[in-house]
Amino acid sequence: MSKPTADNAPNAAAKGAPAVPANFLRPIIQADLDSGKHSSIVTRFPPEPNGYLHIGHAKSICVNFGLAKEFGGVCHLRFDDTNPAKEDQEYIDAIQSDVKWLGFEWGGDVRYASDYFDQLHDWAVELIKRGKAYVCDLTPEQAKEYRGNLKEPGKNSPFRERSVEENLDLFARMKAGEFKDGERVLRAKIDMASPNMNLRDPILYRIRHAHHHQTGDKWCIYPNYDFTHGQSDAIEGITHSICTLEFEGHRPLYDWFLDNLPVPAHPRQYEFSRLNLNYTITSKRKLKQLVDEKHVDAWDDPRMSTLSGFRRRGYTPASIRNFCEMIGTNRSDGVVDMSMLEFSIRDDLDRTAPRAMCVLRPLKVVITNYPEGQVEQLELPRHPKEDMGVRVLPFSRELYIDRDDFMEEPPKGYKRLEPAGEVRLRGSYVIRADEAIKDADGNIVELRCSYDPDTLGKNPEGRKVKGVIHWVPAEGSVECEVRLYDRLFRSPNPEKTEEGGSFLDNINPASLQVLSGCRAEPSLAQAQPEDRFQFEREGYFCADLKDSQPGRPVFNRTVTLRDSWGS
């Protein structure tokens, strides 16, 4: 299996992008430690608890937690919980579970931006006292008009020159709950003519009469992200505040707050390119829409781009970590091909997944010349290379093969079973198809075959049998359900639609096929949830985390054996 790279994997990175280090942050951190600027490093991962983590977050997790671990530092998990109307404890629990599942531990207790609400409020008051913040009564529509655009400077709010005393009074009344949601905001007084739109008197506080999952009903004013981010970093002693490139334009504002407040430290913000993966959606709003409108079963549906979805589908933490390392950390935006992620999981499972046989579309085979009542216990390796021991398959007169492995009128080059043709059963004997039994509608319901008793573990004398197919014994095999998952979207860019269209128009109608009545070899009867296997000739599968039970297994296809989508 050849390893795709940014050069030979389709769309792995932006075409023409210059060569960059695997992680441009490593030499920066090393230099800071060598110079004594920092004695140790502290990073943070600050998700907003308004949805489940997706594959894009995996890169941020691996960067922040990975660098901290590599350099002997710590990484904080801090929830940016400044918008109570959209946040939920369910998301907080899921995020913690996902970070741990990926193999990382945060330093100390879980932290919340809401832990610092009192301090942030005091700093907002400090900005008012310094004449650098004011209460504004403009409506959202008016504020948008006053803000200007990239070509035109903004205009000062008519409330910009309120006195310090009036601003302190109004802000105190905002905090006391005297005003309705949206009636007033607190804004920083910076520069309405700045070419950087983020510096045009940004909002610091909004009024939201909403119950907060951590602070209850203590607050009815909440700080926005930009006012919370840098100061929280300063409080926690973050040395390297690492975020994605869309926040590059926010860095001057990040620094402005730290420069104008009596903070205990002045962290430095660094930006790297976010993970853009084709055939996926990572907008939390759109992921939530998929769930709410029941296009998928839940946030952890194995077709979703959420980490819980990838986990349930059978992806391993190592495969996702290795994928994030493979694509590198740089400042060059591009689109990574899904085939790179699929390569990573195939590479991992090829080495770690035990082999097993499962017949997805069973066709009964009766070996007419095999002694009735006789059973042989055949030993097959659990892995062709790794020492995983053996599993035992009972071989007797009746067994199942896949319906797709027999054709009455096969095309040229067909190497499976056909009338009067021979094929080897994996790890067993060579059989010949003698007769196809059909029902009243002409459907094949059973094959009558004969076997060559001298072909166990060796080729028959004087003839070459090319085809090898998988099978399971009729007696002892376990009935199971198999879910064949594929990419949720049929377009590399699901966001690209016809005028007036929706990303939902690009949903792949063949993203899930549920097969019942499948037959698995006896060793799979006691498969535990999340046990992973290579079903020989079929793909990589795992026992479903929610629905699979010993004796009644449900298997999800993680990925096919080869890329079926092409380059």
From Swiss-Prot:
| SUPFAM superfamilies listed in its UniProt record | Nucleotidylyl transferase, Ribosomal protein L25-like
Sites where the protein binds L-glutamine: 80, 225
Please give the Gene Ontology molecular function terms for this protein: ATP binding; glutamine-tRNA ligase activity
**Under which name does UniProt file this protein?**
Glutamine--tRNA ligase
CDD domains membership? GlnRS_core
Entry keyword annotation includes Nucleotide-binding: yes
**Under which EC number(s) is this enzyme classified?**
6.1.1.18
Q: Assembly state and interactors? A: Monomer.
The domain of life for this entry's organism is: Bacteria
Q: Where is this motif: 'HIGH' region?
A: 47-57
Organism encoding this protein: Pseudomonas putida (strain ATCC 47054 / DSM 6125 / CFBP 8728 / NCIMB 11950 / KT2440)
CC terms in the record's Gene Ontology section? cytosol
Report the subcellular localization.
Cytoplasm
> In which residues is ATP bound?
48-50, 54-60, 244, 274-275
Which Gene3D superfamilies did the record assign?
Glutamyl-trna Synthetase, Domain 2, Glutamyl-tRNA Synthetase, Domain 3, HUPs, Ribosomal Protein L25, Chain P
UniProt catalytic activity: tRNA(Gln) + L-glutamine + ATP = L-glutaminyl-tRNA(Gln) + AMP + diphosphate
Q: Where is this motif: 'KMSKS' region?
A: 281-285
Q: Which NCBIfam families match?
A: glnS, PRK14703.1
